[in-house]
Amino acid sequence: MSRHLWKNQLSEMVQPSGGPAEDQDMLGEESSLGKPAMLHLPSEQGTPETLQRCLEENQELRDAIRQSNQMLRERCEELLHFQVSQREEKEFLMCKFQEARKLVERLSLEKLDLRRQREQALEDLEHLKKCQQQMAEDKASVKAQVTSLLGELQESQSRLEAATKERQTLEGRIRAVSEQVRQLESEREVLQQQHSVQVDQLRMQNQSVEAALRMERQAASEEKRKLAQLQAAYHQLFQDYDSHIKSSKGMQLEDLRQQLQQAEEALVAKQELIDKLKEEAEQHKIVMETVPVLKAQADIYKADFQAERHAREKLVERKELLQEQLEQLQREFNKLKVGCHESARIEDMRKRHVETSQPPLLPAPAHHSFHLALSNQRRSPPEEPPDFCCPKCQYQAPDMDTLQIHVMECIE
């Protein structure tokens, strides 16, 4: 209501003056307000010059009033435009305030989502640590099995050396028996009738020796079969261990890479959004200073931005920690591969030595088994000397001990 009355007063103020009567009234009012009544003269003293001067002054006053009315109209229009602009600016600020509130809510939801993702990443990390501990335990058990197999290999090699020495002893005895056979061949025809009983006894002893040799050969074949079973079990264990390590580490590395990539993409998108919002906040900083509510919301948004930056720094540190753990796992995996390759090389060397070795023979009495030794010497071809060769650098060793020492140094 007061605004309507004020507009009516303004419209009355800006109305143009009517005529001379109104001019005289205005002059009278001016004189009543304290101004000197210069034009209020008695009629008997009026002259044309005085009347002309009064008319000129009246015209000047009318022009001044018209100019003042024009200025009042312009000021009124400016005031109306200012009110409209203030109303539009208020609506614009309210719209921006609603947008900022929605944006803060959306950022809060994204913050909760990132917090859940971080918790999931922590759970995955705990699972990875447990898997790593399990792998370390499996590695220790496999190392213990490899150590036991190496001990069995060394024991087999020592047995092989003992059998080689026994074979050399038997060869010497065979040579001595051959000499005795040549000496006894000359006497055989003379003593054949006298020693028929002894020949029967020797034949029986020969049969017993052959039975003992067959039992020894069966025992040697059984040991070979057990050794082959151990080799097959070791090879299968190595394959299972290798496949288990490859599958588990491949899946873990792929999951870690995907999680890291997702976290990086989320951080990049969040940083772009934060930069964009920061630019908009800088642009509307002057406008927001006039509105206390928006200023409080901006302070809240700034606190959220600082929290998001702190969370982003923590995520970056977490990413670096995961990257270091990934590199450590890769180094351990490479060490395991190198150890497996070395074990495979030792196994190949052991297989070569087992294939080149011969089954041991039992020593037989010289005076009871010369017929059997002579027949074996005639049937069997001459044996080749053992090949003590390094499988890596082809080094020719004089004996098995030297070859073992060289192989360990060559592998290291």
From Swiss-Prot:
The keyword Zinc-finger applies. Residues 150-250 are annotated as: Interaction with TANK. GO terms for cellular component: cytoplasm; cytosol; IkappaB kinase complex; mitotic spindle; nucleus; protein-containing complex; spindle pole; ubiquitin ligase complex. Phosphorylation at Ser-68 attenuates aminoterminal homodimerization. Polyubiquitinated on Lys-278 via 'Lys-63'-linked ubiquitin; the ubiquitination is mediated downstream of NOD2 and RIPK2 and probably plays a role in signaling by facilitating interactions with ubiquitin domain-containing proteins and activates the NF-kappa-B pathway. Polyubiquitinated on Lys-278 and Lys-302 through 'Lys-63'-linked ubiquitin; the ubiquitination is mediated by BCL10, MALT1 and TRAF6 and probably plays a role in signaling by facilitating interactions with ubiquitin domain-containing proteins and activates the NF-kappa-B pathway. Residues 242-343 are annotated as: Ubiquitin-binding (UBAN). Residues 375-412 are annotated as: Interaction with CYLD. Keywords: Coiled coil, Cytoplasm, Disulfide bond, DNA damage, Isopeptide bond, Metal-binding, Nucleus, Phosphoprotein, Transcription, Transcription regulation, Ubl conjugation, Zinc, Zinc-finger. There is a cross-link at K111, K139, K143, K226, K246, K270, K276, K278, K285, K295, K302, K314, K319, K392 (Glycyl lysine isopeptide (Lys-Gly) (interchain with G-Cter in ubiquitin)). Residues 1-48 are annotated as: Disordered. The modification Phosphoserine is found at S31, S43, S68, S85, S369, S380. GO terms for molecular function: identical protein binding; K63-linked polyubiquitin modification-dependent protein binding; linear polyubiquitin binding; peroxisome proliferator activated receptor binding; polyubiquitin modification-dependent protein binding; protein domain specific binding; protein heterodimerization activity; protein homodimerization activity. Transmembrane segments: none annotated. The leucine-zipper domain and the CCHC NOA-type zinc-fingers constitute the UBAN region and are essential for polyubiquitin binding and for the activation of IRF3. Regulatory subunit of the IKK core complex which phosphorylates inhibitors of NF-kappa-B thus leading to the dissociation of the inhibitor/NF-kappa-B complex and ultimately the degradation of the inhibitor. Its binding to scaffolding polyubiquitin plays a key role in IKK activation by multiple signaling receptor pathways. Can recognize and bind both 'Lys-63'-linked and linear polyubiquitin upon cell stimulation, with a much highr affinity for linear polyubiquitin. Could be implicated in NF-kappa-B-mediated protection from cytokine toxicity. Essential for viral activation of IRF3. This is NF-kappa-B essential modulator.
